[in-house]
Amino acid sequence: MFDKAIIEFDKALRTVFAPARSVRPVPGDDVPDAPLDDEQKRHAAALMRVNHVGEICAQALYQGQAIMSGDERVREELQRASHEETEHLAWTEQRIAELGGRKSLLNPLWYGGALAIGMLAGRFGDRWNLGFLAETERQVEAHLTSHLERLPADDRKSRAIVEQMRTDEVEHAETALKLGGRELPLPVRSAMKLASRVMTTAAYRV
């Protein structure tokens, strides 16, 4: 039990503080940088910071859910999704730096809150656990779609990253439902949307 706690704590430290690494090529890495003005760069960096925070939260959610799951198949799916989210973390981190931005100062807070929510979701059983995963991915997909509408049209690098992230999130949601995830009640989905709105608003600025 103590060894497991050390492993989970190490995951948290690496997610929040260590540079993320990607196995897959970074989407748009071969696309030349567009000549964006200072305001466009600031805006794009802020949107990518929001996406980076979303991936921090995803790592914590999946970690919390995996800790509480009693089904090896569910844990494996959570770990697979987590690995892809780590790549998203690396992509957004790189793009933020290229745009001259910075990561959120509140990342430890986002991580801690999402970990607690993930563990709480896991306590309700694997079907609800998977349903929570599916709904999370749907909401992330929706907010990534909105970012494609808000990013500067010429920022093809950021757009390529967001498009690939969205594709991955759709796949995660579909897999969770195929594994038996249940649709969450409307009040729960609404509460998740409200929490997401608070996070995205704060992360855009801080």
Curated annotation (Swiss-Prot):
What InterPro entries does the record point to?
A: COQ7_proteobact, Ferritin-like, Ferritin-like_SF, Ubq_synth_Coq7
UniProt keyword terms in alphabetical order: Cell membrane, Iron, Membrane, Metal-binding, Monooxygenase, Oxidoreductase, Ubiquinone biosynthesis
Instruction: Kindly list the biological process annotations in GO that this record carries.
Output: ubiquinone biosynthetic process
**Where does the UniProt annotation locate this protein?**
Cell membrane
Residues at which Fe cation 1 binds? E55, E85, H88, E169
Q: Which cysteines are joined by disulfide bonds?
A: none
One GO cellular component term noted in the UniProt record for this chain: plasma membrane
Annotated pathway: Cofactor biosynthesis; ubiquinone biosynthesis
Molecular function as annotated in GO? 3-demethoxyubiquinol 3-hydroxylase activity; metal ion binding
Question: Membrane topology for this entry?
Answer: Peripheral membrane protein
* Keyword Lipid metabolism tagged: no
Obligatory cofactor(s):
Fe cation
tRNA processing found in the keyword field:
no
Membrane-spanning ranges:
none
Q: So what EC number does this one have?
A: 1.14.99.60
Please share the entry's free-text remark on the cofactor.
Binds 2 iron ions per subunit.
Catalysed reactions, as listed in the record: a 5-methoxy-2-methyl-3-(all-trans-polyprenyl)benzene-1,4-diol + AH2 + O2 = a 3-demethylubiquinol + A + H2O
Annotated binding of Fe cation 2, by residue: E85, E137, E169, H172
Query: What family does this chain come from, according to its entry?
Result: Belongs to the COQ7 family.
Q: What does this protein do?
A: Catalyzes the hydroxylation of 2-nonaprenyl-3-methyl-6-methoxy-1,4-benzoquinol during ubiquinone biosynthesis.
PANTHER family per record: 5-DEMETHOXYUBIQUINONE HYDROXYLASE, MITOCHONDRIAL, COENZYME Q10 BIOSYNTHESIS PROTEIN 7
Q: Write the protein's name.
A: 3-demethoxyubiquinol 3-hydroxylase
Species of origin: Azoarcus sp. (strain BH72)
Q: Which gene encodes it?
A: coq7
